[in-house]
Amino acid sequence: NSGSEAFLWTADNGMVGLGGLTGGNFFSVASGVSGNGSVIVGFSNSGLGQEAFRWTADNSMVGLGDFPGDPSIHSSAQGVSADGTVVVGTGDTELGHKHQAFRWTTAGGIVGLGDLPGGPFFSSAEAVSGDGSVVVGSSNSGSGPQSFRWTAASGMVGLGYLAGGGNPDPFSYAGGISADGSVIVGWSSCALGSEAFRWTAEAGMVGLGELSGGDFFSYAHDVSGDGTVIVGRSISSLG
């Protein structure tokens, strides 16, 4: 049998498979790594369903579970703090398999972050700041899917949309965050289509434009630790 397997690559050892959780059909995906590479997070099949995991060389792959209230599991880890002690992702709540963003710590386990008001219940965490205190992702809201920034002090706060992106079906999604949590990147509806953005508290959401030659579309996936370099994709004249 064969299946998708999470891996760790280093210059010394090349690509090394991380295995999978036990009990389910073999499948694992790595989606985040700590600052020094010692902690890897992702999701894998287990005996109860798809489950978020945290991997270390000492303890191998350990499932993080899900929200209580349902015998089955459907959770995934998407990001991890620099020291590997805080993991963020999405799980199924006891509210009828509705997705909720979570923040996991060794001390507190999985804690739900709620969602923005006004829409059907849904939220998803995609990235976390270096110290684990700021979480970003997307949530349903009264106006449509919307990127958010979460802290323990403020809770979940929507970041809005780019100018011209409010109608008829607005959306914005956050995908990356700088080390100190001050810069957030993602993509949003705009007057011409979908546009990558960079958000700061001072400037708000600022569109990054697109590559020339194709339909108007750009998407920011991640940002450097200092917030100055952003990567993603755009449609261009080459395809």
What name fits each language-model region?
Residues 1-239:
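Residue-level hotspots at or immediately adjacent to binding/recognition sites across diverse folds
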